[in-house]
Amino acid sequence: MISVIKINNIIHLLQDKNTSNWSNDEVLSKEFESLGFYISNHPLKDFEDVLKQYNVKTFKDFENSSVNESFIAGTVMSVKEKRTSKGNSFAVIKFSDLSKVYELYLFSEILELNREYLIEGKSFLLTVIKDKENQENRFRRINVRKIVSLDKITKLNYVNVEIE
């Protein structure tokens, strides 16, 4: 649990005149570094136009919908790489969007293509698909089919970018 003192220290730090020249990215980075979450804004807010263009759902909306495949967006909070018993690499990525914090698995093929870009604080557009329901009908695993940096999309003319 975060103490009121810690939050007050963060607020004081953000109001300090030495931080007035900080970019939005720097402020968000310091918030996340200090608190473990974003308090003044969220990095995905900078990409609202792109998210609308691709009809991106929040993770919570996708999770609760009957739709099996969708675009979602997320900002990386942490990356933990692991190996399967067969030696294949995979990563458990903790993401944050405007609805919640969630974890997704990136398996070796997708991980190998994107490892160098998976940095805390970076935001991504993900194509996700719900796996078949398990036998007890309790949950459906959500798999990442494709992941693209939102910075990369915005540097291109995103109207012409195709995400498969």
Regions found by a protein language model. Give the residues of each.
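Noncatalytic, beta-rich nucleic-acid-contacting surfaces in large DNA/RNA-processing enzymes
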Residues: 1-164
